[in-house]
Amino acid sequence: MRMCLLVMLCVLVMGCQQATEQTQFVGTDITGADFGNTLKLTDHTGKPRQLSDFKGKAMALFFGYTHCPDVCPTTMADLAHAMKLMGKRSDEVQVLFVTLDPERDTQQVLAQFVPSFDSRFLGLYGTPEQIAETAKNFKVFYAKQEQAGKSGYTIDHSAGVYAFDKNGKIRVYIKFGQKPEEIAHDLELII
């Protein structure tokens, strides 16, 4: 009888452990963070946007720029791949790309760049002041680095993605380099 109870207890503990593992984010859990609560920009279709426009959908918010040689296109491609992996559930997620380069990333440039990864993705832009205010609100670092050459400059910037649940609450910081399968996992947990 004792052996039977011991075996049942072990099975119960293992079951609880598996349930816990399945509900943990791969990215950094930032549930309850007191930043990243305001955004007022314009999307690449010309429509004014704020975070509350997307309530009812999970959101993945990335700050970057279209002339970025590596981090930005890689992150956008990884987000697009994650959306494909999610199948129909991806309809419950809105991906937002906020430009950190309002000088070059016009509405027209964003309208070509952002949907090239997934037609549902939205690019957001604003004045340099609006971008600075939004980046500060999300604790995003960015700095223009002058360079010789055709583009004239690059922008050093934070490289993670902020994920919000359907209630508009910030939940996860998805680190640069997280695999599409891991991104999909984290997004599915907050849908």
Placement of each model-derived feature along the sequence:
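Short, hydrophobic alpha-helical segments
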Residues: 190-191
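N-terminal "domain-start" segment that seeds a small globular fold
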Residues: 20-52, 77
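Short loop/turn microsegments at loop-to-beta-strand junctions
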Residues: 36-37, 59, 158-160
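Thiol/disulfide oxidoreductase modules built on the thioredoxin-like
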Residues: 130-186
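Sec-dependent signal peptide recognition
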Residues: 2-7
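Short active-site neighborhood of thiol/selenol oxidoreductases, capturing the structured segment around
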Residues: 51-73, 79
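C-terminal motif of bacterial Sec signal peptides marking the signal peptidase cleavage site
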Residues: 12-15
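Structural microenvironment flanking redox-active thiols in thiol-disulfide oxidoreductases
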Residues: 74-134
